[in-house]
């Protein structure tokens, strides 16, 4: 189905919720559904790998100390909690190592928001007081609803602008996305879906200062999963949320989160439903090949090109001959990741959000994966020597749509020679990562934490999910100790 532009009354909130309720599997193109399955597989891979890193285990212990036992499963653990606690843990696991998906125009990590909400909602349906089975196809349709909602809400707020101003955009855009997806899976009416979205939106937030010293950045997308799930569970029993939350000029979601952005118009509510059902944001969700913030992937690839083109100059034992490195970034990426480190060593989160560290790690280790954020790397003399020589700057050449994750690298050497390279759009954005490459990434990550038989069973289950009568079969495979 498709929808028209917003009504004269300007109620794009109702239009979105009507579309959510009425969307049928046959409305979704086959390639979109196929991509959704691969994004699900990628999210599960990230959750499995992230479930037992130190900060995830600390979160799991803290929640286990105070949460009673429930019926919702947790990735990588033999424990069950209530739906909100399970959503918090699963979301924090998927975001734990910065390998999960991202949307480059309206920045959010969709899997870490949607999978936790939908896993819990499915188990509420199948194991709660009103028992009913959720099919794999029903799950996938709800997942597509979330994939479509988050980026559209973000576009109504000028996408990455929120990130430039210090908000953690993903938990903001992600809260209504999780509500819409959960509402679809729970079978809510348009009116109740609108309540769920309103309840989620009034809880939304997230501060980007979380990227420096703490661990809490890992859990902020999980807050959005919880917000949306909670909104849908309340609305399912008739609890009324904010209506017209995207349309209200006083205290509305778009109005408040765009305060002070200096834009005209301040926000664009029509973007919430523009081309809904015609153009599919699911296929615009990007899959990561590097274990760091998506905005720095262009920088990594520019450095990779320099390393290939000038192997003698960039040999590890010759890096001391570098005099200066200048990294040019888009406005939102510079604001987010171009900061100068204030202390050594950085935390793992700080390293994954810092362009100078990311570039230095690429030069020293030839890759930016999980090992580059272990303590030995975070305090490496070779890395810090290059960090001290790195300056990040804003360049408007990357501010145009579609180029926010690009970068230009200029390297000056002690002998006076200068080399440079530029990547306008990193791989994963243009060209996008293929489904074959996602499966390859899944196998590489999953094989590090589970045996080959379990890996294959999960892969088979996900890639044939539309034929499954009960999604709980998949949930049983991904829960349980690793």
Swiss-Prot record:
Protein role: Cis-aconitate decarboxylase-like protein; part of the gene cluster that mediates the biosynthesis of oryzines, natural products with an unusual maleidride backbone. The two subunits of the fungal fatty acid synthase oryfasA and oryfasB probably form octenoic acid. This fatty acid is most likely activated by the acyl-CoA ligase oryP to give octenyl-CoA before the citrate synthase-like protein oryE catalyzes condensation with oxaloacetate to form tricarboxylic acid.
Pathway: Secondary metabolite biosynthesis
Assigned EC number: 4.1.1.-
Keyword Lyase applies: yes
Keywords: Lyase
Lineage: Eukaryota, Fungi, Dikarya, Ascomycota, Pezizomycotina
InterPro entries listed in its UniProt record: MmgE/PrpD_sf, MmgE/PrpD_sf_1, MmgE_PrpD, MmgE_PrpD_C, MmgE_PrpD_N
Coiled-coil ranges from the UniProt annotation: none
Membership in a protein family: Belongs to the PrpD family.
Lineage top rank: taxon: Eukaryota
Native species: Aspergillus oryzae (strain ATCC 42149 / RIB 40) (Yellow koji mold)
Keyword Acyltransferase: no
Protein name from the UniProt record: Cis-aconitate decarboxylase-like protein oryM
GO molecular function term, any single one: lyase activity
Gene field: oryM
A Pfam family the protein falls into: MmgE_PrpD_N
């Amino acid at each position: 189905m498709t929808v028209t532009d917003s009504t004269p009354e300007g109620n794009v909130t109702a239009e979105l919720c009507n579309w959510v309720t009425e969307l049928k599997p046959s409305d979704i193109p086959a390639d979109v559904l196929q991509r959704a399955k691969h994004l699900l597989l990628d999210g599960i891979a990230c959750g499995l790998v992230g479930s037992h890193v130190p900060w995830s285990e600390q979160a799991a212990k803290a929640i286990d100390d105070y949460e009673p036992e429930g019926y919702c499963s947790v990735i990588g653990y033999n424990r069950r909690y209530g739906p909100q606690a399970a959503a918090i843990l699963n979301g924090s696991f998927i975001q734990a190592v910065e390998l999960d998906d991202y949307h480059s125009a309206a920045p959010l990590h969709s899997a870490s928001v949607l999978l936790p909400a939908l896993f819990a909602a499915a188990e509420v349906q199948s194991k709660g007081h009103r028992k009913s089975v959720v099919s794999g196809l029903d799950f996938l349709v709800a997942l597509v609803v979330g994939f479509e909602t988050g980026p559209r809400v973000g576009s109504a707020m000028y996408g990455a602008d929120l990130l430039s101003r210090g908000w953690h955009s993903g938990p903001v855009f992600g809260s209504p996305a999780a509500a819409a997806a959960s509402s679809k899976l729970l079978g809510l009416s348009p009116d109740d879906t609108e309540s769920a979205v309103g309840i989620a939106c009034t809880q939304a937030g997230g501060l980007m200062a979380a990227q420096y010293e703490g661990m809490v950045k890992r859990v902020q997308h999980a807050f959005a999963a919880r917000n949306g799930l909670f909104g849908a569970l309340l609305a399912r029993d008739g609890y009324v949320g904010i209506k017209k939350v995207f349309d209200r000029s006083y205290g509305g979601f778009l109005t408040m989160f765009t305060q002070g952005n200096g834009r005209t118009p301040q926000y664009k509510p029509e973007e919430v439903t523009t081309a809904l059902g015609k153009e599919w944001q699911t296929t615009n969700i990007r899959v990561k090949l590097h274990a760091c913030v998506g905005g720095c992937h262009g920088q990594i690839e520019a450095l990779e090109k320099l390393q290939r083109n000038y192997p003698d100059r960039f040999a590890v034992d010759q890096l001391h001959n570098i005099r200066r490195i200048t990294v040019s970034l888009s406005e939102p990426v510079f604001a987010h990741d171009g900061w100068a480190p204030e202390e050594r060593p950085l935390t793992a989160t700080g390293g994954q959000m810092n362009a100078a560290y990311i570039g230095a790690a690429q030069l020293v280790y030839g890759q930016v994966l999980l090992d580059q954020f272990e303590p030995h790397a975070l305090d490496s003399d070779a890395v810090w020597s290059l960090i001290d020589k790195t300056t990040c700057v804003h360049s408007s050449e990357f501010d145009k749509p579609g180029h926010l994750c690009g970068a230009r690298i200029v390297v000056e050497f002690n002998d006076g020679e200068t080399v440079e390279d530029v990547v306008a759009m990193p791989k994963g954005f243009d060209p996008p990562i293929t489904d074959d490459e996602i499966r390859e990434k899944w196998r590489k990550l999953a094989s590090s934490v589970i045996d080959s038989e379990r890996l294959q069973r999960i892969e088979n289950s996900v890639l044939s999910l539309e034929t499954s009568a009960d999604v709980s079969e998949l949930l049983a495979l991904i829960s349980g100790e690793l």
